[in-house]
Amino acid sequence: MKHLHLYILSALLMTSFQLSAQVKLGEGLEADKTVHNFGDIKLDSGPVSCTFTLTNTSDKPIVIYQVVSSCGCTDVEWTKEPILPGKKGKISATYSNDEGPYPFDKTLTVYVSSIKKPILLKLRGVSVEKPKPLEESYPEHIGQIAFRTLELNCGNLEQGEVKSDAVMVANLSNSPLNVSFEDISPDLDISVNPNPIPARGTAEMSFSVTANRSRWGKNKYWATPVTNGKSHQEKRICIHAFTRESFKNISENDKSSGPRPKFDESTFQAGKVRKGDVIKATFSFKNEGKKAFGVYKVDIDAPQWAHSRISPTEPGAKNSFTVEIDTSDLPEGEMLTIVTLTTNSPLRPIVNLFIAGWID
């Protein structure tokens, strides 16, 4: 009886995991994944195939209108008949694997009846002439689990979205490796499959970021690997993502009548400065829209920086803000620093400004 209870609990946990692993593509449509990673494949092994499964969670039929591959090296087939509520459809792709011994990243652009924007699916992998040792293919080691890199990118997402991706990881040991994660950043989900990872084998590490209105612009999400119960605090996985406002549910008229900043200059010329000096750059703008303009976040690609507060700007009003760049940690020579504003403007949700100069 005890074993039966454990079996039922295990089955429930597995079912719960599988349900949570579904990726929401839009209102009423989910997928089992948006990225398929083939890992390392031999160049002479021939074509490789995968399948994406879509589930209709709405109360109306959904039609896959078209699936377009990013190159002629990938053939695609999909469910042509309407997908009824609660039912599933499939998109199958075959990569020719004849482009040479290189990494590949192919995109399938999917057009469906229920979603205005096209859905992007990815096929990834590395085609190799001869298999390399795991230690060489996955140079970043944390205990017995190995990665190609510890710096991952989840891309851009809008508020209300969940963005997912996946990479391959390896088990360097001669026995199965159980993998879990701790100290996981809020809004990040991360898991490995299969788990445990077979001895001297590979697995897919899937991760997803859920947009949160407390996080805007550039963000980092962290996770610490735990292998066979041992925590590895010496290194952590870092996942980058960029979050912007969502305007998908507003009309074209509302977009055109929304806030619209117009900057006097998009580039501040700092001229020649000495290394260690602080550059002070002021950017002025006018809100030519019909609603108040606001900035959710300012990101600056420099080691040491600060900026003044950007107060809400009413229609027709002018405003300005100042950015300070400490050049102590910047290399000598030409500099070009990007200042990125994440805003509430439907026409300019992202504004890039620049600080140019020369550091002696």
What are these language model-derived features?
Residues 28, 58-90, 174-202, 290-320:
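Surface-exposed binding patches on compact interaction domains or structured appendages
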Residues 280-288, 293-301, 305-344, 348-358:
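C-terminal soluble interaction/assembly domains
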Residues 91-99, 205-213, 321-329:
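Short, hydrophobic beta-strand segments
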Residues 21-47, 53, 114-163, 172-173, ...:
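Long, low-complexity ectodomains and other extracytoplasmic segments of secretory-pathway proteins
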Residues 51-57, 166-172, 208, 282-286, ...:
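Short edge beta-strand/loop segments characteristic of extracellular beta-sandwich folds
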Residues 1-26:
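Bacterial Sec-dependent N-terminal signal peptides
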Residues 34, 45-51, 98-107, 159-166, ...:
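Short, solvent-exposed loop/turn segments enriched in Ser/Thr/Gly
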Residues 57-60, 99, 114, 172-175, ...:
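Short, acidic/polar linear motifs in exposed loop/turn regions
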